[in-house]
Amino acid sequence: MTSFYSALGLNEFFTLVRGNKYPLDLLNRNFALSLRGKAKISRHMILKRISILNYKNLEQVELAFSPKLNTFFGQNGMGKTNLLDAVYFLSFCKSAGNPIDSQNIRHDADFFVIQGFYEAADGTPEEIYCGMKRRQKKQFKRNKKEYTRLSDHIGFLPLVMVSPADSALINGGSDERRRFMDVVISQYDKEYLDALIRYNKALVQRNTLLKSETPVEEELFLVWEEMMAQAGEVVFRKREEFIREFIPIFQSFYSFISQDKEKVGLTYDSHARDASLLEVLKESRTRDQIMGFSLRGVHKDELNMLLGDFPIKREGSQGQNKTYLVALKLAQFDFLKRTGTTVPLLLLDDIFDKLDASRVEQI
């Protein structure tokens, strides 16, 4: 089962039966759920309709949505997850599963197009268009005007997705957990996203110098290290603030779903906490030159996921891991709802898999 909740939030949901080229049936049902806390919301953004051509295995889809809850049923391989991924693409300018845009074009096709038709709380329509042809640059437009920077779109349509791929947050490398922080913070804080982009650009340049087979003057290193330090301090500070505010929300969701059976936590480690980031980079330079890349910096930060006092990767059962991930994503939704100016869309893909009956009932 695949679902998404509209920008009206999780207060009361209603589904409408609709059809399309694919057997994705929508059920009529009422849902109610109360979330803790009140959001600081100035507007809603409802996805009214989506049009998809040649995206992954979806040849042609035209769907109109309920403004509340939409639930999709179908056999494996019919395209339910790809439909959610198309909605995700409209928010983040990329696929949740495959960042190589050309590989998302349907086999035997030369292009894909995704169009989303949204409506703000005041009735203002918003049209988001993404199109790509093979061997050409992706086009991303809002109301027929192309973005000069895709980063300007991030946060306009906030979104949270719960999917089986979330297991990488526990079992994958630290880059997966940094990406989690980046995705959340970037949706409500433009300063963070700009600093992250500047940091990564400077990191690429510094790594190029580190790989140089000829001697590089210190002044050249300092240009990029100073940029990394300046942007990195912003990234560190905002990640630290986010985690501090996020932990109690996450713990509250986990406690509710597990019925207080376990305690969980998050801790954040960063080289920027050890000393001035510029000094950290300078001190690490000789070793970095030997290795050919930057060993220290906020690109090596770690978000530790704990069950009790131990890493959940080592201690958690399948059910505990799934509970942890669902609580993490529902807390992300609630956090963005409280912090941002627009209620996020919430996409749920096989949310109940690996959970026992009592935890399913709590959700």
Regions found by a protein language model. Give the residues of each.
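Short hydrophobic targeting helices and cationic amphipathic motifs
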Residues: 5-8, 14, 23-26, 31, ...
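Conserved NTPase motor "head" modules and their coupling/switch loops across ABC/AAA+ ATPases, GTPases
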Residues: 30, 40-75, 216-347, 354-362
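Conserved lysine of the Walker
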Residues: 80
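An accessory alpha-helical subdomain
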Residues: 168-258
